[in-house]
């Protein structure tokens, strides 16, 4: 079925394709695979492990001449995790560039994605939008390939330009007889614009941001913190949020620093908790949220001081290309009840 759909697309999308002419200079065949499936498939949430549209480009590395480009605005009848192409190329080192999920009405690029974009234009693109869903996650892949034989095979792994926060809430074992109800989880300073090249780690200016909430009508009663964490999987998260990378340059939080605000009832008494998404031992990118990373946030209401204890663990979507760049460790930090003053989060 997948091959049949691809055959239909080749026919229907030919007007958006810049083919390679069969000249004597084109002495090699390049077979490449676009792959979006994460190393750990357990990290997939909904459709964020697949794509529904794809823009492809092949450039000469030396002079950045585009030898091939193709826009596939829609894959039907189903989304894909992998896509392959085989094209004739000249015997020069190539740069393959791919953008997945580009054809989304909520995305606005600084320059419209078209078959005739240069490599420089692609690497300087910025993108903005108003909202995220699991089905519109922007992914970009870039791969340098040496054409050193008549038949060359390459794989282009895709990086997600977002971070995802999965928030799981529980109550301490000591609160078994207490009623703990969560009314809302708010993610403050969700970033809505980014540089589309994963290699550009700065943030565009001005920064576009907003606050988003998961509201539980009637409240959600918290269960006890389980000893078996096998059920801690994305589909069981109380809330999941996406954001473009949020780089906080200093060890001191600023107005753009991301944090969460949780409203809960403890035996009928209302509390609001606020805290940054970091841990006590973290020094590099202490307050940042990095692209291509899933953050597992375990939040537990504790007794007797009504503390909210949080354990945050970042997982690279792709182990070889995450911005984390270090071994992952789990550290606890605590959030104190929020007193209404936004000046000081802990």
Description of each model-found segment:
Residues 86, 93-142:
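Signature of extracytoplasmic/envelope-associated structural regions
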Residues 1-3:
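Sec-dependent signal peptide recognition
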Residues 28-36, 165-171:
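A short, amphipathic beta-strand motif
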Residues 19-23:
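Acidic, glycine-rich segments characteristic of secretory precursors and extracytoplasmic regions
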Residues 119-161, 168-172, 280-338, 343:
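Extracellular beta-sheet/turn segments enriched in Thr/Pro/Gly and aliphatic residues
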Residues 14-17:
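Bacterial signal peptide processing site
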Residues 40-111, 164, 173-291, 342-346:
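Tryptophan-paired
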Residues 9-12:
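C-terminal motif of bacterial Sec signal peptides marking the signal peptidase cleavage site
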